C-alpha cells in the first residue's frame, strides 16, 4: 500500500481517503473470516485500553509470558544468549516453570514475539549491539542518500525498515519467518539504491 501511495501522483487528500477506505474494507473482512484472530484481537485490545494499559496487557497475555521468559533467558545468558532459533527449546526448560506470570504455563513458543527480546535471549547483548550498529549505520547511510536523491522506492523501504525495528511492537521470528523475508527484501531495496545513486 505504501508503494502505491508513494509511486502514483495523487493528491494528499486522495491518498488519505484511499488508505482509510482500504483499511475499512480489508480489516473487517479479515476479522469476520477468522474467528480465532477476532477473539484474540478484541481480548488484546480490551487488555491494552483497560486500567494500567500496556503493563496489564503484558501481565495478562501469553505474549507477556513469552517476553517474561525471554528476559529470564537473557539474564541467565547475558553475553551471547542461547543461540539463534534456540528460544523454542530454552523456554521449555523446567528451570523456568516457576516464573511469576499468569500465563507462565504458556511461555513455550518458537520466539518471544518481539524483536529485541528475541535478539537478547538468542544472541545476548553482543548480538543485539552488533545488530544495532549494523542497522543504524545502514539507515543513516540510506537516509543521507535519500535526502540527496529523493528516490521514493528507497524512502518506502526506509520507512518499512524503521517501523519494523520499533521497540515493543510485536513481531514474528525475525531470523526465520516470512516477516523476516519481507524485512530483508526492503532492507536490500533500501541499501541497493545507495549503490545505484553512486554510479
Give a label for each model feature.
Residues 28-32, 62, 138-145, 165-169, ...:
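Hydrophobic membrane-targeting alpha-helices
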